[in-house]
A protein has these predicted regions:
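Solenoid-like repeat scaffolds
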Residues: 12-23, 53-68, 107-119, 148-150
Length: 150
């Protein structure tokens, strides 16, 4: 993702994700949707989002004493927000208010997660993505507050 090679042949590899954790399958779907969006393939991005929504809808409930893994939900909200932003017709600075609201929901979910060791569980931390969206829209006063939490 950080290389921003949205047309990389590796994105077309068929990888068997049967039996992987929901967060790992969600990461794959998020990257597929995001790369499609970055290539200008809105239908492909919407297909990735639909698959991500289906994954989240069909996840088994957590075991007793365990909490639901929020990473797949965060990734879904991030991809939804990016699609809304790409759709244009926004509010302040060109960012649709519903895209910002989705990102605020994603940041709230992320903030409530326990701190993990190692790299972030999601490929694009929600505060970072919200900050980038606000900066791209020219909302310079709002963006630093979003990124301070990273």
């Amino acid at each position: 993702m950080n290389a921003e090679r949205w047309d990389c042949p590796c994105l077309r590899w068929s990888i068997d994700l049967a039996g992987v954790r929901a967060r790992d399958a969600a990461l794959d779907l998020f990257i597929a949707g995001l790369s499609a969006l970055k290539r200008g393939d809105r239908a492909g991005a919407e297909h990735g989002l639909a698959d991500l929504v289906a994954l989240n809808r069909n996840r088994a409930p957590p075991d007793p004493g365990q909490e639901r893994d929020q990473v797949p939900d965060i990734l879904q909200k991030e991809l939804q927000a990016l699609l809304r932003q790409a759709g244009g017709a926004g509010g302040a600075g060109g960012v649709p208010a519903d895209a910002v609201a989705l990102m605020q929901e994603a940041t709230a979910l992320e903030d409530a997660m326990p701190v993990e060791f190692g790299p972030p569980a999601d490929v694009k931390p929600a505060h970072e993505l919200l900050g980038e969206m606000l900066l791209q829209a020219g909302l310079f006063d709002d963006a630093p507050r979003s990124r301070e939490i990273i």
